[in-house]
Amino acid sequence: MIAYCGTTKMSDDIDWLHSRRGVCKVDLYSPEGQQDQDRKVICFVDVSTLNVEDDSKGAAGPRSDGELNLENLEEKEIIVIKDTEKQDQPKTEGSVCLFKQAPSDPISVLNWLLNDLQKYALGFQHALSPSASSCKHKVGDLEGDYHKIPSENCYSVYADQVNLDYLNKGPQNLRLEMAASKNTNNNQSPSNPATKSPSNQRSVATPDGECSMDDLSYYVNRLSSLVIQMARKEIKDKLEGGNKCLHHSMYTSGEKGKTSPRSAVSKIASEMAHEAVELTSSEMRGNGEEGRDGRKTFLYSELSNKNKCGEKQQMCPKDSKEFADSISKGLMVYANQVASDMMVSVMKTLKVHSCGKPIPACVVLKRVLLKHTKEIVSDLIDSCMKNLHNITGVLMTDSDFVSAVKRNLFNHGKQNAADIMEAMLKRLVSALLGEKKETKSQSLAYATLKAGTHDPKCKNQSLEFSAMKAEMKGKDKGKTKGDPCCKSLTSAERVSEHILKESLTMWNNQKQGTQGRVPNKVCPSKDEKREKISPSTDSLAKDLIVSALMLIQYHLTQQAKGKDPCEEECPGSSMGYMSQSAQYEKSGGGQSSKSLSMKHFESRGAPGPSTCAKENQLESQKMDMSNMVLSLIQKLLSESPFSCDELSESENKRCCDSRSKQAAPVAKRPEDQSQDSTEMDFISGMKQMNRQFIDQLVESVMKLCLIMAKYSNNGAALAELEEQAALASNGPRCGREAVMSQSYLETPGPEVIVNNQCSTSNLQKQLQAVLQWIAASQFNVPMLYFMGDDDGQLEKLPEVSAKAAEKGYSVGDLLQEVMKFAKERQLDEAVGNMARKQLLDWLLANL
């Protein structure tokens, strides 16, 4: 007799995160002294860990629509098999819950945990309910395959009749008897069975003498079908080491050697099954692999290897480094490519330089440097954003936040990139040409870009840096005027000049090819500026950094195309610079924002009396993060002796126009030319956007990400709570199940014994036990026992439950702690921290 339980949505009625029900006690199961107590036994089986091959289609025709294939069991389906006959132990009732465990979801941890928690809750619900209440209607026996009802966003529960007894001779002595009856749907009786797929329990049944001959024939035939399919699998696999199938055979003590009478129909099949079991038992005893009295675990591919390969035994373990190797393979290939190109270019440079021709080799070196610098910067930015997305989840789906963080990270990384490029150029020059640096005095000009500040309290420091920069520029101009004949350049200067010339030419060509509307006056301006190069290594290194910044800014603009509002307003321009410049020329400079006025101050500047008013307006308007970061990049470009006035001007106008359209509070008003000529002090401070401010900005963003990732407060899960609320409102409640679950939430239930038949990892085993503990607590179970903890992974669970009860934790509090652990573990995996705690250790330390 089969009891079918209809579609169930019980768990949607429970607000798990806010449940105030107290946690129950937990202990490990011991069979002594618990015979007279009323208790329930639940066996949870994850069908995804069972390797089931269905070969019955070729022998018995295609599978009918009414049959359920356990291989295709959906994640929303649960099969519950209940024990309705309690002859030997009337106070013990057993149930088996078949389900498929949901894969981990790093984006939505709450949905992932609730998916498994709801399945365990449904198992407890139907196990704790009376046997009669689970019957909705009756269908015929399908020999282990159950009638399937399509389900979408709900859980389908199927129940069958079974006798499940736990004996007291050992902790793992399990006898599982399947009830057989006539099949009324397929017109097929157990006395003439077709070849069916094996029971997904992988259990060798030992029926009592009360069973009829037809029942024995039915059981033996199913067992023979299992043996035949295992033999086919062993022949097919050929010991390839993949898809290992772990089977659990469960016996009762004292009945292993007994042979049951067989019918004539299944005599040959039963002999094959008996020989296979005896062969397995004898080989495992000979190798010292015998388990406890009533349970044996063996690997079928290993047995086949022993039979066919003699004494040689191959375990075929899965390589634990396969995943790490696959990840590092791509990185190593890319690193080798970069290293090879660099080595070849250096060798060519040395070879050509020995012949006295450094220029062609420098062109090769320049191309390699520019190519790989651009690729590395692009890959770093992309990888940073991907890692941030994995850590913060919902936070990084905000386009405004992503844009601000991306620009902020780029500006922060620019500081180190500038030092690296400068050091690289100097080391290459010294290694190739053996020249020493003549002076280091002008390196102070770079310090002004890093150590300055626009804080009014540090205004004196900004003025000192501004004066230092003006002095350095005056010295450079004096040197240039003092040598009008343009003396011959050294080899180091030729190296730098060619690198700069080619890089700027390439950048200009790319811009012309994509935009098509570049004014012709840009290139002559570059040539005029190029003639005024200061013949020092520091100045050339600075210009190289400027060209790198231009390329990086071009790359960022191309990547953000279509996402930035300013890009949408100017679709015809790939960079969005020249169109804004043309608009500004037509308007005559009548409107401006902070960036535009800054450029005007820079070109005309002298100190004036309206500085305090400007500073107050700056503080009140609170310029957004991305505007400040981009303004710093544009100031760097404008400081270069190679940058074009028109280009820098158009860059600042583009930023100013787009920001003024995007930010409503920014005021637009005409600028008085007399006031523009009196603002050099204020702008000298604005030019000194110090590195300390950027460092604090990046640190604040990263702290925000860490706080949200670690869920430091209980209200941080609001985004996922909305998803849970949406799931809870997707469909109507099932009235009968809601009433039944409500009745069992109010009254204390019997003690429950849980046995998990899942070959999962240690973390999954502990997480599964904790979620089952939470589900049992919600159903008012007074005492929960776990059996089958042979490896000792759950030995700390009683201590955790005692501590949680002492601290007054509820079901919702415990689930939130599990969520915090899952978030911290994902964060550790993202940063490469391998020293991770197990779940029970973490709970002991943090409860």
Curated annotation (Swiss-Prot):
Propeptide residue intervals: 1-187
Location within or outside the cell: Cell projection, Cilium, Flagellum
UniProt function note: Major structural component of sperm fibrous sheath. May play a role in sperm motility.
Phosphothreonine found at: T206, T505
Protein's name in the database: A-kinase anchor protein 4
Compositionally biased residues, Polar residues: 182-204
Description of how the protein assembles with itself and partners: Interacts with PRKAR1A and PRKAR2A. Interacts with ENO4. Interacts with QRICH2.
GO biological process annotation, one example: cell surface receptor protein serine/threonine kinase signaling pathway
Species per Swiss-Prot/TrEMBL record: Rattus norvegicus (Rat)
Annotated Pfam families: AKAP_110 (PF05716), RII_binding_1 (PF10522)
Domain comment quoted from the record: RI-alpha binding site, predicted to form an amphipathic helix that is required for binding to Prkar1a.
InterPro entries: AKAP_110 (IPR020799), AKAP_110_C (IPR018292), RII-bd_1 (IPR018459), SPHK1-interactor_AKAP_110 (IPR008382)
Positions carrying Phosphotyrosine: Y300
Region ranges (Interaction with Prkar1a and Prkar2a): 218-231
